[in-house]
Amino acid sequence: MSEQGANKTVADDGTVSFKKDRLEIGLRPMTDAELNRRFSSYEAYGGGSPNPYTFGGSTVFRTGETPQRFTVFLASLSNYQYPKVYLDPSRVYITTSNGRKYYALNFEQLSTYYRRYIRGGTGGNDPGVSGNAHYLLKEREGILKATMFVDEVVFSAQELEGYLVFEPIAPDVNELTVHIPDVVVRYDYKGDPIENLNVEIHFEREVGRIYPDGSKIPNSNRRMAHDPTPGAD
């Protein structure tokens, strides 16, 4: 499996966990297929599905493929060690082997992303927005609020789980590191942070290149790119 460094383990489902005593922070890369199953009740909607994380079953006309809408990780935090722990999801970012950098998207950014799909019509709660479009937007926002990793303190003997969402990782990236900076684990008597942790978790991807015909590798040797998996040295 992967060589993740000290205090890290890799589970059978691909979750990489950082452990410090009885504090555990885990990341699991999610495939579009897994996310579609998670919201399978919306699968029949295709590209109009309220599932906010994928394009569902819709395909691109010219290639017949379903593009990746976002790169998604299931993040978990289990705190049985400290009085309270704080992980700021907006500060999580990805660096890649070829120099790219991706910051986690917050709810407001994702809501803005989906508002651009609302076009014309009348009705709904906003002027010029159709009732159906407004309903779809609110469904997506509701799912995001219920399933994204929440920006809040995790007290002793509590656990927190939710999705971290990024723009799609470029197809030429074969190695990436997820950085979780400044996880606060101790506070002074005034409530100010006095001790924090910086967590880095590494993944590898099997990737190809985008060719003029739209394939990810030449048609003579076609191989689809995979979502991130724990990297192996």
Could you say what each language-model-derived stretch is?
Residues M1-D233:
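Conserved functional micro-motifs across diverse proteins
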